[in-house]
């Protein structure tokens, strides 16, 4: 794709149109003023409006723009131990058979990343031609640099070291790119994010909703520092966000992920979706259970459900509140907000059930459904809702700050716990008991479990976490389970169920024991890229 993209660099009008065609209202104004055939490098970069139009085009095609809801990003939760997405392409991932010729997942992420990087490089090479206020120009340059750095963060997370392209290339240059090291990629991205943060505003008016904030640049930098295990740097970065005093922990939880919560001050980075125009096609359709008129494409594993603590703060294995005949009673309220629980959740006046005929198939893959993004009483177009897509929340900042402090061997005090993890789990709608544990080993496990339940199905957070913690292979190498189907598994024949142990009587879903290789923690470099450029090397085990 790098060669395909950079082959176009000599056609200036085509490059400009890449930034224009995805727009709506602004596009008509421009075309009324100037025919497409007249677009040229000299005529386009002449006004502030041109710069803003080009910047909007970068946003729209990026991983935080209108492409953010593409399936291959939403389904990457199924590259973790949290969920099962019953789709043929995702099945390849989940069964351990993803190959370099895949285009939906491995190919799409790579292509979108480098398309955005190319647009940013072209933008930065030309924006100085525009006469506009110096502070405003610095701000739009900062936004463009953020979008490029964000793509490099994503590419580094999915593929490891990748070609590091910082300028518009000639065709010959594009055909000879080699993979930079992971450190080179992450160092460049962090440097760009530092520069961007200096010129980005801490807040924006409602009219600029969806544009990048200072905290977003710092939060992605923090993610990179956690990835690189630069704990001291991460502590400083996350503290800088906290000290901005611009974001809060919303007292609500479920509403944050619905259209009514899209202005929450907890949200640091999101994609602005507009129903019927740039609508979200997934939340009210793909996640909506079939019993309520949706597809229910993705199902949570019992392994995730079991991670939600009891209201007394203890796990189900040790809490006196746990009753195996009523397994969903007295649990962390985030369980009820996140997952449709079979024969328990009531939604739109109807109890959630998964027919046995649907278990293990596209409908009801595990017997559990994802409730987090589905709006009760939704009456709009299911395939084009106005639900924004959240990428980063302030809760991530606080939990990451605590983790970085822990791993940097800094003092763990009750005050620190209260400022971070207890603030997250203490929101009014959740109100879980405070964490008081200061033993470093025990607290590490508490933080990791807290991240798992707080951010369940939130884009790539779980995948990012198990990768950087070095446990991806271990947590994936197991038999996964769905809902409990019987108390008498020995005589149950409708579906394959576990006969003994912790998950006795539960549906046996995907068995990944012995089917994985450690190299599969990374996606394969797309085969088409290697065919175009023989200097690109493939990731291990593909």
Question: What are these model-predicted stretches?
Answer:
Residues 27-90, 194-197, 211-356, 474-495:
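An aromatic- and glycine-enriched ligand-binding surface/loop that stacks and positions planar moieties
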Residues 186, 231, 411-414:
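TPR-repeat structural position
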Residues 2-13:
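Bacterial N-terminal signal peptides that target proteins for export
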Residues 26, 113-116, 188-190, 257-314, ...:
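Long, intrinsically disordered, low-complexity segments
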């Amino acid at each position: 794709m790098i060669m395909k993209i950079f082959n176009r660099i000599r056609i200036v009008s085509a490059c400009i149109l890449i930034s224009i065609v995805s727009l709506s209202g602004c596009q008509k104004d421009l075309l009324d003023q100037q025919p497409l055939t007249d677009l040229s490098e000299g005529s386009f970069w002449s006004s502030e409006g041109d710069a803003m139009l080009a910047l909007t085009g970068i946003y729209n095609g990026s991983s935080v723009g209108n492409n953010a809801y593409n399936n291959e990003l939403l389904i990457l939760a199924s590259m973790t131990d949290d969920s099962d997405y019953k789709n043929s392409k995702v099945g390849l991932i989940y069964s351990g058979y993803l190959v370099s010729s895949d285009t939906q997942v491995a190919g799409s992420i790579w292509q979108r990343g480098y398309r955005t990087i190319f647009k940013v490089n072209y933008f930065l090479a030309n924006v100085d031609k525009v006469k506009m206020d110096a502070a405003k120009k610095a701000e739009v340059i900062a936004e463009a640099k953020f979008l490029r750095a964000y793509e490099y963060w994503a590419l580094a997370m999915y593929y490891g070291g990748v070609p590091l392209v910082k300028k518009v290339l000639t065709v010959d240059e594009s055909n000879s790119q080699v993979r930079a090291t992971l450190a080179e990629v992450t160092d460049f991205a962090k440097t760009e994010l530092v520069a961007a943060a200096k010129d980005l505003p801490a807040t924006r008016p409602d009219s600029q909703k969806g544009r990048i904030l200072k905290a977003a640049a710092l939060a992605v930098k923090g993610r990179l520092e956690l990835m690189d295990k630069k704990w001291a740097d991460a502590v400083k970065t996350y503290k800088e966000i906290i000290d901005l005093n611009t974001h809060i922990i919303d007292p609500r939880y479920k509403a944050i992920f619905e259209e009514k919560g899209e202005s929450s001050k907890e949200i640091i980075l999101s994609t602005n979706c507009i129903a019927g125009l740039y609508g979200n096609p997934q939340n009210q359709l793909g996640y909506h259970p079939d019993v309520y008129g949706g597809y229910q494409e993705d199902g949570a594993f019992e392994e995730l459900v079991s991670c939600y603590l009891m209201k007394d703060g203890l796990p189900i294995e040790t809490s006196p509140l746990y009753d195996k005949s009523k397994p969903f009673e007295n649990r962390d309220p985030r369980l009820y907000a996140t997952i449709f629980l079979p024969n328990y959740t009531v939604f739109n006046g109807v109890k959630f059930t998964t027919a046995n005929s649907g278990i293990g198939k596209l409908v009801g893959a595990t017997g559990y459904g994802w409730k987090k993004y589905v709006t009760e009483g939704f009456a709009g177009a299911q395939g084009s809702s106005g639900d924004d897509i959240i990428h980063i929340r302030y809760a991530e900042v606080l939990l990451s700050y605590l983790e970085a402090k822990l791993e940097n061997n800094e003092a763990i005090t009750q005050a620190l716990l209260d400022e971070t993890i207890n603030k997250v789990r203490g929101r009014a709608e959740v109100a879980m008991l405070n964490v008081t544990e200061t033993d470093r080993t025990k607290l590490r496990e508490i933080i990791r479990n807290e991240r798992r339940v707080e951010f369940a199905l939130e884009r790539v957070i779980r995948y990012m976490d198990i990768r950087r913690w070095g446990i991806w292979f271990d947590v994936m190498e197991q038999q996964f389970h769905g809902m409990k189907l019987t108390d008498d598994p020995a005589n149950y024949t409708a579906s394959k169920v576990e006969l003994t142990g912790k998950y006795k009587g539960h549906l046996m879903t995907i068995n990944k024991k012995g089917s994985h290789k450690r190299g599969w923690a990374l996606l394969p470099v797309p085969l088409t890229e290697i065919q175009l450029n023989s200097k690109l090397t493939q990731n291990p085990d593909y």
